[in-house]
């Protein structure tokens, strides 16, 4: 989490968020993979705690760690199965993903075992010029980005099907493993357009 007011609302000290996350992730991984867990850490006191049913995936579901700053990129490389971000341009994504891979090597992990995910807003319409103002208004009023990160509304995929395909191909060429598309205002007709006019034309 990067939004300090969310932590203030629940009485959690913002600067402790990284430590709390790592503690809770370690606990979750143990509950997923061990028959029972006994430990005492901070305000947690578990005695032969059992979590059933165990996850279908073995040893556990993929853990994608999201965030922007180097501390989070290091955490993803050290503790996660991959990195998750949103609203990154191809250039911004590449810069941070290269860091994750380098950190993985630093921690003695095989970088090829990690995956990457970028979430992108998309609006398919008559032309980029026509839909861009509406997309910008939506992203600037109903979404939020960390001003000190590479997350930006400039990432937005919008325009004709041809234009959207061209913009998405630039992301695919970064080597990103997974793109999550967020249709403009979650409109069902946008989902249909993306599925029919855009996705079939993308090439890895």
What are these regions (language model features)?
Residues 1-204:
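Active-site-adjacent structural elements that line small-molecule/cofactor binding pockets in enzymes
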């Amino acid at each position: 989490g990067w939004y300090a007011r969310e932590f203030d609302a629940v009485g959690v000290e913002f600067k402790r968020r990284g430590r709390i996350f790592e503690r809770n992730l370690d606990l979750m991984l143990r509950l997923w993979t061990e028959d029972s867990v006994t430990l005492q850490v901070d305000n947690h006191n578990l005695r032969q705690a059992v979590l059933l049913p165990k996850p279908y995936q073995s040893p556990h579901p993929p853990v994608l760690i999201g965030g922007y700053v180097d501390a989070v990129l290091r955490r993803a490389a050290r503790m996660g199965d991959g990195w998750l971000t949103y609203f990154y341009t191809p250039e911004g994504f590449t810069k941070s993903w290269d860091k994750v891979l380098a950190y993985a090597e630093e921690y003695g992990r095989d970088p090829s075992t990690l995956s990457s995910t970028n979430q992108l807003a998309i609006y398919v319409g008559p032309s980029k010029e026509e839909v861009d103002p509406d997309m910008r208004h939506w992203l600037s009023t109903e979404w939020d980005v960390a001003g000190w990160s590479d997350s930006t509304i400039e990432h937005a995929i919008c325009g004709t099907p041809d234009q959207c395909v061209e913009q998405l191909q630039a992301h695919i060429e970064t080597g990103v493993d997974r793109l999550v598309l967020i249709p403009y205002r979650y409109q069902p007709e946008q989902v249909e357009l993306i599925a029919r006019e855009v996705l079939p034309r993308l090439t890895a």
